[in-house]
From Swiss-Prot:
Record-given protein name: Acyl carrier protein, chloroplastic
Gene3D superfamilies registered for this protein in UniProt: ACP-like
Pfam families: PP-binding
Modifications the protein undergoes after translation, according to the UniProt entry: 4'-phosphopantetheine is transferred from CoA to a specific serine of apo-ACP by acpS. This modification is essential for activity because fatty acids are bound in thioester linkage to the sulfhydryl of the prosthetic group.
Length: 134
């Protein structure tokens, strides 16, 4: 075995593939004079990062959903609850969004509001909009 000093690290990415070359800047015991890995793989065109909403936001959204849909107090509405599973139609969903906007003093863009299907999605969007106002 021999000690090899390498000093380059590079990464090249395109919309369809990524090539990564890994080299070492510190002495490394290897049997070749250069150690590198070439990896080719597809890179997704979109990256989505989702963060859980604050528990207090989820709780408020649940209460508003119950109120807007005239649900009983003992009806279980949690983060994963889908509006459709509660019997909400598109008009009900619009009313839920209006109630949320009023309660949290925010305005939801129509295209984002139309994508909301669960309590969690509504709470995440609300947290995002409230944070953006600060």
């Amino acid at each position: 075995m021999s000690t090899t000093f390498c000093s380059s690290v590079s990464m090249q990415a395109t919309s369809l593939a990524a090539t990564t070359r890994i080299s070492f800047q510190k002495p490394a015991l290897v049997s070749r004079t250069n150690l590198s890995f070439n990896l080719s793989r597809s890179i997704p065109t979109r990256l989505s990062v989702s963060c859980a909403a604050k528990p207090e936001t989820v709780e408020k959204v649940s209460k508003i959903v119950k109120k807007q849909l005239s649900l009983k107090d003992d009806q279980n509405v949690v983060a994963e609850t889908k509006f459709a599973d509660l019997g909400a139609d598109s008009l009900d969903t619009v009313e839920i969004v209006m109630g949320l906007e009023e309660e949290f003093h925010i305005e939801m863009a129509e295209e984002k509001a139309q994508k909301i299907t669960t309590v969690e999605e509504a709470a995440e969007l609300i947290d995002e909009l409230v944070q953006a106002k600060k």
